[in-house]
Amino acid sequence: MVSSKEIIQHRAKRVRRQIKAAANGRPRLSVYRSNQNIYAQIIDDVRGCTLASACTLEEGMKKSLRSGSDKKAAFAVGKLIAERAKKSGINEVVFDRGAYVYHGRVKALAEAAREGGLSF
């Protein structure tokens, strides 16, 4: 019997494998979603370092948002990560949704990042 944790890990590996094949040297926009907050970071897998990051726990975000776990918060994080990526000179990324379904908060973050100028 396969546990739900193993299914999630397998799905994340499958998505990561597809991203690695399509990356062509582009950094990846990785999303982590918890029950309370949402986090995004742009990672350069070639050098193994984080180029930009944003989350709902940052001081400016915490004060302006009612909750860190809704679509508005995800949209704000998407806008912020796109802004920080632009400052770092990053225009193209590969979107890494991990094991999460492209729906709800993950989709809101992706659309905000696209609206902010990132292309993927």
From Swiss-Prot:
InterPro entries: Ribosomal_uL18_bac-type, Ribosomal_uL18_bac/euk
Record keywords: Ribonucleoprotein, Ribosomal protein, RNA-binding, rRNA-binding
Single Gene Ontology BP annotation: translation
Keyword Transferase applies: no
Keyword set includes Transport: no
Gene Ontology molecular function: 5S rRNA binding; structural constituent of ribosome
Cited function: This is one of the proteins that bind and probably mediate the attachment of the 5S RNA into the large ribosomal subunit, where it forms part of the central protuberance.
NCBIfam families: L18_bact (TIGR00060)
Family matches, as HAMAP family: Ribosomal_uL18_B (MF_01337_B)
Protein name according to UniProt: Large ribosomal subunit protein uL18
Organism: Bartonella bacilliformis (strain ATCC 35685 / KC583 / Herrer 020/F12,63)
Gene this chain is encoded by: rplR
